[in-house]
Amino acid sequence: MRKALNIHPNNNPMYPKLLIVCLVLMINSANAQTSITAINVVGNTSVDSADYFLQKGLVEKQNGRRLESLKNFEKAAKYDGSSKAITAELASAYFDLRRYNQARESYKKLVELGDASAANYKQLMTLSYQLKQNDDVLLYADKLKRVDPTEKVYFYVGKVNYDMDNYGEAIKFLNEAAKENPENAEVPYMIAHSYADMMNYKLAIPYFQKAIQLDPAKNYWIYELGLICYAMHDDKNALKYILEAGEKGYKRDNDYLENLGIAYLNVGDLEQGVAMLVEILKRKPSDLNILKMVAEAYYYKGKYQQAIDYWDQVLTYDKTSATSLFMIGMAYQKKGEKEKGIALCDKAIEMDPTLAANKQKKMMAGL
């Protein structure tokens, strides 16, 4: 007969060890389950909190409380920064509150999150334009055009190239912009300015005229056209446009009066030309350049005594002006007082020997 095995716990030395192992496994399993539950709770809490602040922000937005809505969207973003819905509301709120730098960054993030829509690219293009981020304007204009070929981007591309003094590209894209929006007066104006900045005044003029035709109230454009005509020695049209600019409200400051005075003198209207320059002298009585200009205007119109009077004023402020003394001498000779005139010219030549050549030239030219 077999002997019965004794398996009583008290008699088995392995039993306590097995019991300990089982207890450890049970504790670890419970801890692991608790950790997983905690993670799920935290995750769910973050999502719930983000949605709570998002919904609260939407209510504030609907009630017209834009700043309060922004505060809630910012809180929502802290809980869930990868939410497209929250990022979109955040971008819109920043934009509405004119926080354009933050709006631009939010729209960039929205694109990074996968929302590469035409609307978002358009916002990025226009915000980059407002913030003078020229390279980004070109980048997002290209992306926008690829996503939606019907979008009008050429004005922005042309303007950026114009601002960067890249006139060739500016003219190319601005001509395309003119096709997209023929009524935008800024387009021909920038083309005109591009040609003018390259000293190609002949090509600039028709674009200035087109811009003014589209927006006749722009008195500064009219004034600029007058100056372009002046540079081309088109004195009649220079006077016409400078006068028109003044009639349409361009400020009659000293620069304007000087250019208007010169324009009058260039068409032979001594009285009006001098009147403009004298108006400047009321404000700037010791302006030597204007005094000399008036003196020369009188001299070349045969008004020799008036010329002498103004060159005398130059000498009052600058006794070393040999040229003014020389011209006074020439004026006296023209008046018939040759001896007095020659003596003054000789004295001027002593002060500045280079004037001797001028004397010879003027005598030969009968001036």
Regions inferred by a protein language model and the residue ranges of each:
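N-terminal leader/linker segments that initiate helical-solenoid repeat arrays
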Residues: 15, 30-101, 105, 112, ...
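Register position in tetratricopeptide repeats
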Residues: 62-63, 96-97, 130-131, 163-164, ...
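TPR alpha-solenoid repeat register
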Residues: 52, 86, 120, 153-154, ...
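Structural marker of alpha-solenoid helical repeat scaffolds
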Residues: 79, 112-114, 146-147, 180, ...
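Terminal, low-structured helical/coil segments at or just beyond the last alpha-helical repeat
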Residues: 35-44, 266, 326-367
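Canonical tetratricopeptide repeat
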Residues: 55, 89-92, 122-126, 156, ...
